[in-house]
């Protein structure tokens, strides 16, 4: 059986971490693409030299040529300008649209059948732009957002309750920004809902509210601490989990920015936004789950925020 090919467009902190995780998990051969001369090649050589130590036997190479995307099974896109202190995801819009155009055309001409995962921010708009320029069908392109946001939610809950994070199931829907919706109703600890934990006095409502707020600003918290960049370990781990579900046909249900059809969650148009999504060898399939009236209202606010940014993106493209 031929080995799978995973191409990482953008060889920065997230791209390099993605490559390392892909090797450790033995997902396939790795190509690191970046426009910076020498940098992807240097990282690829460094990563290749970890293979004897890790006990894996895969190829890793760096490139500046979009032709090397040819026959990729998975393409994970992190290219773009990263967030800086005081910069919102939305500030990145104009710059990164141009990046998505270049990357999208590279995918279109070299690997139109690849499964594409977008990580570039502002996420919900960038995955929309990437599809526009690449022509990849709805079921073969998705944005990495909810897996990361949910991981942050789970981490904060586990820390607050002093339990194993593996016992915490928590989900976040909506746009990958300040309007995201951590689902307190369907989230649980070892099967016990957060609402029940609050009723039993094991979790104070004000602490839960603080955790929800911290989850929404989780990315910004890390940006403020790092001062010179943004998160990359957890975003890379999230992207690899999604890629692995596709490559191994795991059919995992993960919160992702998938193309949600009009009619689902009250949408009046097709829209990339974070919802529970099955990822299999056939690609992505958004799933509608029951949420509370309050969460539905919050989700609508988030949907409107994504739609507003899409309008701004359309105006930028029209100039």
From Swiss-Prot:
Q: What InterPro entries does the annotation carry? A: L-lactate/malate_DH, Lactate/malate_DH_C, Lactate/malate_DH_N, Lactate_DH/Glyco_Ohase_4_C, Malate_DH_type3, NAD(P)-bd_dom_sf
One Pfam entry for this protein is: Ldh_1_C
Name the Gene3D superfamilies on file. Answer: Lactate dehydrogenase/glycoside hydrolase, family 4, C-terminal, NAD(P)-binding Rossmann-like Domain
Which EC numbers characterise this protein's activity in its record?
1.1.1.37
Q: Which GO terms describe its molecular function?
A: L-lactate dehydrogenase activity; L-malate dehydrogenase (NAD+) activity
Q: Does the keyword Membrane apply?
A: no
What top-level branch of life does the organism fall under?
Answer: Bacteria
Q: Name the CDD domains for this protein.
A: LDH-like_MDH
Catalytic reactions of this protein = (S)-malate + NAD(+) = oxaloacetate + NADH + H(+)
**GO annotation (BP), single:** tricarboxylic acid cycle
Q: Where is the active site?
A: 176
Keywords from the UniProt entry: NAD, Oxidoreductase, Tricarboxylic acid cycle
Quote the record's binding site residues for NAD(+): 10-15, 34, 96, 119-121
Q: Where does substrate bind?
A: 83, 89, 121, 152
> Is NAD included in the keywords of this UniProt record?
yes
Q: Which family does it belong to?
A: Belongs to the LDH/MDH superfamily. MDH type 3 family.
Entry function: Catalyzes the reversible oxidation of malate to oxaloacetate.
Protein name per the record: Malate dehydrogenase
* Source organism per UniProt: Francisella tularensis subsp. mediasiatica (strain FSC147)
Q: What's the name of its gene? A: mdh
């Amino acid at each position: 059986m031929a080995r799978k090919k995973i191409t990482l467009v953008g060889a920065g902190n997230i791209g390099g971490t993605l490559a390392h995780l892909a090797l450790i998990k033995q997902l396939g051969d790795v190509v690191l693409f970046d426009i910076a001369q020498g940098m992807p090649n240097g990282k690829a050589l460094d990563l290749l030299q970890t293979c004897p130590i890790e006990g894996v036997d895969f190829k890793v190479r760096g490139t500046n040529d979009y032709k090397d995307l040819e026959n990729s099974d998975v393409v994970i896109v992190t290219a773009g300008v990263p967030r800086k202190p005081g910069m919102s995801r939305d500030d990145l819009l104009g710059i990164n649209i141009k990046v998505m155009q270049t990357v999208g055309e590279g995918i279109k001409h070299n690997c139109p059948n690849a499964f594409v995962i977008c990580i570039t921010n502002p996420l919900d708009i960038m995955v929309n732009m990437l599809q526009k320029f690449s022509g990849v069908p709805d079921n073969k392109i998705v944005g990495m957002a909810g897996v990361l946001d949910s991981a942050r939610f789970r981490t904060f809950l586990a820390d607050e309750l002093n339990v194993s994070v593996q016992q915490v199931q928590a989900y976040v829907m909506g746009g990958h920004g300040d309007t995201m919706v951590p689902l307190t109703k369907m989230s649980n600890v070892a099967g016990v809902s957060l609402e029940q934990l609050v009723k039993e006095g094991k979790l104070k409502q004000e602490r839960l509210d603080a955790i929800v707020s911290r989850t929404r600003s989780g990315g910004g918290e890390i940006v403020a601490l790092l001062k010179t960049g943004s998160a990359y370990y957890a975003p890379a781990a999230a992207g690899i989990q999604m890629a692995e579900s596709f490559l191994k046909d795991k059919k995992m249900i993960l919160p992702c920015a998938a193309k949600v059809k009009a009619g689902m969650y009250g949408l009046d148009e097709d829209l990339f936004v974070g919802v529970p999504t099955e990822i299999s060898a056939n690609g992505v399939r958004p799933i509608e789950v029951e949420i509370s009236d309050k969460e539905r209202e919050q989700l609508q606010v988030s949907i409107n925020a994504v739609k507003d940014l899409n309008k701004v993106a359309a105006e930028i493209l029209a100039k």
